């Protein structure tokens, strides 16, 4: 299903009982987080707080939307799919775009016509009078303190913008980059842009500084874009494909964009709110601490400051927000859904992979379980190295467990049985030191640098062991069938 904007998606969620309107006055200071967290853990609906107030009780006159992607099925719905399993089709499309193959013949070419039709929706459509610019604020009228920006946890240093889609462009790039980076509010017109050095926005900024020393770097931030555009910003799209183009594929219609008022960056035309401004390469500020998706408060570190020169918005704008904390939180739920997108991408490069699972309790990316159809001695170690190196999304994965295809990667009882019966700790553990690690990972000895562990929990082949390998116990199919026929009659359970 196509959603023209965030409001269209909200209407659909309300029709199917997946949106709850909260009319009571609710404070954006901590209370909204607690309500959202309890709702998410109960697998409840998206929440629209229609009467958001400040800590002192002052009304904001702007509703707040939280838990939009609070269940995997809502993520699938936002991607135009009926359920999470159908997201494998999205992954297959991305795998094809990442490494396209020519048709093997006329019949194969006919089979790929639907894909080619989808590709026609990739170019953006520029709108001259966009909804996102119905209201324009500049100069002294720019005041972020009038927006219902959440303070999520007791130890958070300041209100935090969490769902902003930051739009950047490198000096030698035609395509724009969309990334979601949290932004600490410093004052009425300044926020801190917290992006890690390997992320697209940070790389664009570094290239700009080299080419234009001392100059201000233009940035725009969209809040409340349509669901396809939001998810395009968090999906592992190929580097050659823009997030706007991928959003068009998801939506089945071209992404509508508009030129920012103060710069040449294109923003989602139907977004609820746009922040426009610049980064001064000389202006940095300490960011944090904030409660993060790890379940801990992160360290304070310096990041560039964005000066907001303009705020544009729709009439009766909705502020889209979230919180991050110990899983499950909204990023963890997104991770569960996007896991299905990753599987076909990995399988295209490594056909032996049967399943791939990132447990949400592992902070969505720090531990991976892979099952393979093992073909030779040492095969598991090759797969470990492949996972760490193939997609940048797995650069920070600390632990990779590889099992045979008789193990259910998503069942801890199965995985632990394989680890305890098929692993020798010395022989089957791979340790790699001094590798890139998420700087939020305070368990690493050095910020941003730590070790990785691979665990080979597969059955061992000749060359990997000198011992006779155990044969798993299993009942014959004939006896299973006999008991199946008797089972109801026995009335045991």
Curated annotation (Swiss-Prot):
Enzyme Commission code(s) on record: 4.1.1.98
Cofactor(s) this protein requires: prenylated FMN; Mn(2+)
Pathway(s) served: Cofactor biosynthesis; ubiquinone biosynthesis
Cofactor note as given: Binds 1 prenylated FMN per subunit.
Localisation: Cell membrane
Positions of Mn(2+) binding: 177, 243
Reaction equations catalysed: a 4-hydroxy-3-(all-trans-polyprenyl)benzoate + H(+) = a 2-(all-trans-polyprenyl)phenol + CO2
Gene Ontology CC: one annotated term: plasma membrane
Gene Ontology terms: biological process: ubiquinone biosynthetic process
Keywords: Cell membrane, Decarboxylase, Flavoprotein, FMN, Lyase, Manganese, Membrane, Metal-binding, Ubiquinone biosynthesis
UniProt keyword NADP, yes or no: no
SUPFAM superfamilies the record matches: FMN-binding split barrel (SSF50475), UbiD C-terminal domain-like (SSF143968)
Residue positions of the active site: 292 (proton donor)
Binding positions (prenylated FMN): 180-182, 194-196, 199-200
InterPro entries in the record: UbiD, UbiD-like_C, UbiD-like_N, UbiD_bacteria, UbiD_Rift_dom
GO-annotated molecular function: 3-octaprenyl-4-hydroxybenzoate carboxy-lyase activity; metal ion binding
PANTHER family noted in UniProt: 3-OCTAPRENYL-4-HYDROXYBENZOATE CARBOXY-LYASE-RELATED, FERULIC ACID DECARBOXYLASE 1
Similarity section: Belongs to the UbiD family.
Subunit relationships: Homohexamer.
Primary role: Catalyzes the decarboxylation of 3-octaprenyl-4-hydroxy benzoate to 2-octaprenylphenol, an intermediate step in ubiquinone biosynthesis.
Protein name as catalogued: 3-octaprenyl-4-hydroxybenzoate carboxy-lyase
Organism: Colwellia psychrerythraea (strain 34H / ATCC BAA-681) (Vibrio psychroerythus)
Lineage: Bacteria, Pseudomonadati, Pseudomonadota, Gammaproteobacteria, Alteromonadales
Annotated gene: ubiD
